[in-house]
Structures are given as structure tokens and as C-alpha cells.
Amino acid sequence: MSEPAQEYRLVLVTGPSGAGRTTAVNALEDMGYEVIDNLPLSFVPRLIEGPAIGPPIALGLDVRNRDFNATALIELIDGLTQDARVQLEVLYVDCSASELIRRYSQTRRRHPLAPAETPAEGVEREIDLLAPVRARADHLIDTSEMSPHDLKAELARWFDRGAATRLAVSVQSFSYKRGVPRGVDMIFDCRFLRNPYWVESLRALDGRDAAVEDYIRSDPRFAPFLEKLRELVLFLLPAQLEEGKAHLSIGFGCTGGQHRSVAVAEILGKALAEAGWPVSKRHRELERRAAAVLPTHQGEKA
């Protein structure tokens, strides 16, 4: 009986110029990844030809790539995700527009998308260009208030394969109307909880607001649900770690992805962090709304 084929472990690293992508790929190289920077997108499929041997690969991609465009990158991500031989993670190194402009002004560098214009014009253009890619990221790290040392430490939490005693957990909220996120290991449906949307004073808020959380907690079904959820997840995490898993993604869905799923993701994330597990949080629909309203949006820390 033949053994199952080994998986390629591939991390795609992207994000706006000046956010820290180069620092990120250098940090991954220090962790033992084979780093390939600015490879043309059309060449990437060649990386997974033949047997999967050697260290995991970190592939740096940005707007300076010769054939870069967001649509092509998303198509590449879709293709790699569907390939059973590939274990893919997409890392988006983000930064607020104001901080990117400050960094460009401080270093007096020209922006690659606007070499003859102001840094602000290049930054705005690049954030708009990369918005669809940002929405597809598995890991989102906002470096707006990070030093290079802080970024390296955060990356080590998620990607240091030598840290066999760690299991990184991500919790994310989403709207069922927009589909289930890819790459989620466990999904919990929060639509049975009382919906704050129907309370006029809560409609414009989201699950991170105390008033919304209090309303959801007032549902008599919430407390037993949270107790059982916390007990289940804390039971499963050590078992997942024993199986060699480095990352576990937990999704929470509701109708609009604004109130119930966000609140539950926040509450469970806090409970897991208090129990000692590295946790990151993402709220997909809130990120999409922020990107649509304000093109030069500030990145949300994962």
C-alpha cells in the first residue's frame, strides 16, 4: 500500500509597500522557510511540480512583480487551495494609510505605483488594488504600531514550525449570505441567538460594542451555549496539537455577519486567550464594509 503524497507547505506573503512584507519574508527565512521573493505569478505553479521535499516555502508577492494583478493572484490562490498536494496559507502584512504615508515621507522613497506623484496617491492606489486580496488572507497582521521586532515576534507565534508546543487559533465571523470562508476547520451557526438587528438602537452597532454583547448575553440560550462551546474547543485544542496541527481556524456565522457572530467570536477569542492559547480575530464582513466606505482604510489587527 503506497503512502499518501507529502504536502507542499506554502505561505504567500503580500501587502502594501512599506507595511513590512520584506521584514516578514526575512523573518520566515530565519525560521527555516525557503524564501522566494517577487517571483512572477505565472511561475508559481512550477514550484509544486515533482515531489514535495525540502523546507516549507515562503513566497513574497507585491505590486512590483512583473505580471502582478489582484485578479491573477486571487485565481492563483483559488487554484492552490483546490490542489490536494498544497497546504496554503496567505499572509497579508497590513498597515494604515496614514502610517504608510508617514513611512514614505520619512525615508523619502518613491511609491512604486506613483513614482512621479505624492506617496499619498500611490498608497491610496495600492490599497484599492489589494483590497480583494486582503479579504482572502488567512492571517492579517497590522504593523501600524509595530516595530520590526514586534512583527518578527508576531510571525513567530504563527509560523515558527520549531515551536511544536504551540497551536495558533484564529476565530472569525462571517455572513452566511456571503458564503462560508475557505480554510475554516470548525463552524458554529449563531443564528439561533436573539438578533440585535431588530433593535433600532443596536442596528448600526456591531458585536464588538458592549451594548450588543449585553443584549446577546441576555438571551437565556447564550450562557449554556457559551459554556458548552468553550468546553468543547478547549477539549479539542490539545488533541489537535497532538496530531501535529499548527493552526486551527474556527468560524462563527450569522445572517449579516455584524452582530451575533462577531460577539461570539470576540467572547470565545478572549476565553481562549485567557486559557493561554495564541488567538487572532477577524470579522470578514466588518472588514469588507470598512474597505467599501473608506478606500484608504486602516488595517485591523488580526
UniProtKB/Swiss-Prot annotation:
Pfam families: PapZ_C, RapZ-like_N. InterPro entries: P-loop_NTPase, RapZ-like, RapZ-like_N, RapZ_C. Coiled coil: none annotated. Disulfide bonds: none annotated. SUPFAM superfamilies: P-loop containing nucleoside triphosphate hydrolases (SSF52540). Keywords: ATP-binding, GTP-binding, Nucleotide-binding. ATP binds at residues 15-22. GTP binds at residues 62-65. Signal peptide: none annotated. Gene3D superfamilies: P-loop containing nucleotide triphosphate hydrolases. GO terms for molecular function: ATP binding; GTP binding. Displays ATPase and GTPase activities. Belongs to the RapZ-like family. HAMAP family: RapZ_like. This is Nucleotide-binding protein Rsph17025_2562.
